[in-house]
Amino acid sequence: MAIEVKNLEQLKSMRKAGLVVADTLELLKRTAQIGMTTLELDEIAATNLVKHGATSSFLGYHGFPAVICASVNEEVVHGIPNKRKLVSGDLLSIDFGAIIEGWHGDAAISFGLGEIDPADQKLMDVCEESMWRGIAAGKKGAKLTDISAAIEGYINSQGKYGILREYGGHGIGSAMHQEPHILNFGPAGNGPEL
C-alpha cells in the first residue's frame, strides 16, 4: 500500500479545496427545500465552484454527469441528481468534491427535510457518531484498522444497524481516491501505523 505523504504546502492547497467543499455543503444544506430537485442543488454547487475558482472532482469522473452525488432515502451512495422533487421526510445525502491547485477535497453530508421519522433521525445520528469515533481513533501511532474497529464497534453497540461492506473511506490528495482504503468494519491493530 503506497500512501502519498503530503508536505506542508500541499496540505495548504488541500485545505483550500476542503474549505470550498465545506462551504458548498453548508450552502446546499441551507438551500435545500421541500419541492426542490437534486438537479437544482447540483446547479447551485456548480455555481459555488466557479465562485471559488475551483473545479469539480466528480464531473466526468468515470463518466459521472454531475458535480454532486445526491442520494435520497434508500439510495445508498453516488446518486445522480435528477428532477424528482424532494418531499417532507426525505433523507438526503450529498457527496461533493472540489479541486484547487491540483489538490482534492471531498466530503459528504446527510440531513432530513421537513418532518423526519425519529427512527430515520436515529440512523443518521448513529452514522455521524460512528464517523467521529473513527476520526478520534485515527491518532498518531494508531494502526489503520483501529479506525475501522472504532466505527464498527460503535455501530454494533447501537443495536439493529448494519454496515455496507462495499463502501468505506479513502485517502485523498492529488487524486480523489487514494490509498489507504479504510473499511468501516474489522479488527483493530492492523495496517500501517498512522
Where are these regions (language model features)?
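Active-site neighborhoods and metal-handling regions in enzymes and metal-associated proteins
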Residues: M1-L194
